[in-house]
Amino acid sequence: MAGLVVGVIAIPLGMAFAIASGVKPEYGIYTTIIAGVLISLLGGSKFQIGGPTGAFIPILFGIVMTYGFENLLIAGFLAGIILTLMGIFKLGSLIKFIPKPVTIGFTAGIAVIIFVGQVPNFLGLSGVEKHEEFINNVKEIFMHIQSMNMYSVLTAGICLLAVLGTPRFFPKIPGPLIGIICSTLVATFLFPGQVATIGSTYGEIPNNLPQFKFPEITLDRIQLLIRPALVIAMLGAIESLLSAVVADGMSGSKHNSNKELIGQGVANIITPLFGGIPATGAIARTATNIKNGAVSPVSGVVHGIVVLLVLVLFAPYASKVPLASMAPILMVVAWNMSERHLFFNMVKIKTTDSLILVITFLLTVFENLTSAVEVGLILAVLLFIKRMSDTIVTEKVLPNPNNKHQQVDSRVVTSTHDCPQISIYNVEGPLFFGAAQTFEQSIIGTTHSKPKVLLLRMGQVPLLDTTGESYLSNIVHHFSKHGLVLISGIKPQPKTLLIKTGLYEVIGKDHFFDHTGVAIDYALEQLNRNKCLGCKHFAFRECSALSGELTKGIEERRRAFSS
């Protein structure tokens, strides 16, 4: 039953997505059949329903307008290879690292493009030329608004009412199907020949699958299409894995991300060989599949078979469907996929995420999806690096004399309370390429007295990369000219890197300590006693002690930490 219901829903959506992508409607049906069956059989989710989706419309339409239909098939084929490789190399989990502002931004942009792109069909405008650029398509609408066909508006209005009203009164019946049937009957019998139909625009829909044909793939074509293919693959991966997560939440199952990508990849490799367009997991159809009692991938296979039977038996009737009936279906899809609440909430908070969101959205609408994704990701990475670099804190500290445990504190360091021979710095945050220079300047720029000992407290440094190690090496070599460097509390990852680079041996194994207190005791042993005479800073409790008493105190504290 689930496969039958989803198959009925998929037919009008497949044709609508194909038309909006700039290709004949039958190619959407071919995609629904072939990709739908393969994704169900080979994917990593038991309930996934695959096929053409709205997210692909702008990128596919752009490829068709710029490179032609055959190159669209090649781009889809390349995207399938990329998806398969992503699954083989277990990159499925990496998709979750794509920032939410980027995905919401381009999804909202796609929704706007789809919605505005259907206005001419909704209004029945004649003489409208399709352009790849959004702004030119808007101009076309205003230039031809006087050609509005009220019969088309009436047809589209009937379909829209059916699409919106059917779920409310008859929740088990697919709204798009009822909308198409009702509006087609009205247009056919009440005002025949007054509105453009699929048949009058694209010709009759054949009632059989196309023959196998391998596209002519050359190195030049690969270089030409690799960028849009990458975007198709990324969009397909995001959509399919998001759909699989939704299915997991509804069914209590657990999908296999990498297997899902392999299934999506194989489907997109084979589908273009039969004239199909790129496909991915469809969230709405997958949810419908589960709601109607699906228990296995068989429902997805049945959905493809149902579409095939409809193609064979009822293709001539599909040619009579008005284009005005397709428009409201796609408009509702655009409205539902826009994530408008998340979009406006993220804009309201006015953070760097808001900036990423708006820029990605605007580039999607006014430039192209490829540029939008590239710029959005680069901007997100740069702003993330900036935020992470701001988290590094390097403060000069001393033991707090008012704390019985002698914990260090930056507030007790003053011009009259600071040891000239020992400098202690508390380092907090990831020490990576974005923060390394700030770290170095914070230490070298504030140690004016050339201390004999530099103690770095690195217990709050979770990460050290090679750039951070390089700047730490600069500090070590700078201070080794007149003293030594001690490090306390270092974490496993930074320590492992220092061992690999050799800096651990340069600093010296004996100069690494688990506890700051023991490191301070060691530092006190290295002091030039003559410089301590007459010193008024009293940075440490031991400063007022005699040399023999000092040594005795050090040994006692060592025993206390080792016990």
Give the role of each language-model region.
Residues 389-563:
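Cytosolic C-terminal regulatory domains/tails of membrane transporters and channels
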Residues 1-402:
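Transmembrane helical cores of multi-pass ion-transport proteins
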